[in-house]
Structure formats: C-alpha cells, structure tokens
Swiss-Prot record:
Example GO BP: translation at postsynapse
Taxonomic classification: Eukaryota, Metazoa, Chordata, Craniata, Vertebrata
Role summary: Component of the large ribosomal subunit. The ribosome is a large ribonucleoprotein complex responsible for the synthesis of proteins in the cell.
Record's subcellular location: Cytoplasm
Family classification: Belongs to the eukaryotic ribosomal protein eL42 family.
Taxonomic superkingdom: Eukaryota
One Pfam family cited in the UniProt record for this chain: Ribosomal_L44
GO cellular component, one term: cytoplasm
Region spans: Disordered: 34-53
Organism encoding this protein: Mus musculus
Main location: cytoplasm
Gene coding for it: Rpl36a
Name of the featured protein: Large ribosomal subunit protein eL42
Amino acid sequence: MVNVPKTRRTFCKKCGKHQPHKVTQYKKGKDSLYAQGKRRYDRKQSGYGGQTKPIFRKKAKTTKKIVLRLECVEPNCRSKRMLAIKRCKHFELGGDKKRKGQVIQF
C-alpha cells in the first residue's frame, strides 16, 4: 500500500524555487477519433474481411506505474508537471498516516 500526501513542497520550474504543490493522480484522456492511426484503422476495418489487425492477448503486467500530477499552488503560476513513481498494487492519496504502537481498530 502506497500512501501519498495531497500536498508536497517541491521545486517549481516556472517559479524557480520550492513551492507547495497540489498532488493528484494522472488519468488518461479520451482517445481522439481523428488521430492518424485511428483514422487508418477505421478505414482498414470498414467493409468486408473481418478483423484486420492482431488483437493483443499476452498481458504481462498486473500493475501500472503510478503517475502523480503536481500543480503549483502559487495563484499566478499554476504550472503542472508529472512525476512517475514505482509500480504498486494499492495506491492511496491523502490517507491517514500510520502510527507506531497503535492498536488496530476493526
């Protein structure tokens, strides 16, 4: 389980110094219908002849690399950058911190 705080003081390229950053998890955007590869694929798929390209079935990984999106909280900056961290099965953003010697509540 990886627990990452919602804010982080780190270097901002635009400000040129360490600033607090808001941390969110990166999500992939919607695929464009008009990208060249998609247009080519749709053109090839249309008409008779079934599936024209091989469908990938050999999945190797069970996890994805976590990518953090850091946004500078300075009002006139707001620059954003990505930061990749290692692979993990469980990722948590801003969960409560683990304390030593605490009794586990169920």
